[in-house]
Each structure stands twice: as C-alpha cells, then as structure tokens.
C-alpha cells in the first residue's frame, strides 16, 4: 500500500466519522 492510497483511506474514514458525528449531535445524542 503506497502513501496515496493510505491517505485516501484515512480521508474517507475521517470524513465518514465526522459526518456521523454531526448527524448524531443533531439527533440530540
């Protein structure tokens, strides 16, 4: 696995995590 694909995986995981966190916060936890 090269650094480019590793960065993409990290970016996708971070994006999905932040998105789910925003939705979770809007639902009032």
Curated annotation (Swiss-Prot):
> A Gene Ontology molecular-function term?
electron transporter, transferring electrons within cytochrome b6/f complex of photosystem II activity
Question: Which GO CC annotations does the UniProt entry carry?
Answer: chloroplast thylakoid membrane; cytochrome b6f complex
Tell me the compartments it is located in.
Plastid, Chloroplast thylakoid membrane
Q: Which UniProt keywords apply?
A: Chloroplast, Electron transport, Membrane, Photosynthesis, Plastid, Thylakoid, Transmembrane, Transmembrane helix, Transport
Bilayer topology annotation: Single-pass membrane protein
BP GO annotations:
cytochrome complex assembly; photosynthesis
For this protein, the parts annotated as crossing the membrane are 3-23
InterPro entries registered for this protein in UniProt:
Cytochr_b6-f_cplx_su8_sf, Cytochrome_b6-f_cplx_su8
Assembly behavior: The 4 large subunits of the cytochrome b6-f complex are cytochrome b6, subunit IV (17 kDa polypeptide, PetD), cytochrome f and the Rieske protein, while the 4 small subunits are PetG, PetL, PetM and PetN. The complex functions as a dimer.
Briefly, what is this protein's role?
Component of the cytochrome b6-f complex, which mediates electron transfer between photosystem II (PSII) and photosystem I (PSI), cyclic electron flow around PSI, and state transitions.
| Membership in a protein family | Belongs to the PetN family.
Q: What is this protein called?
A: Cytochrome b6-f complex subunit 8
- Gene for this chain: petN
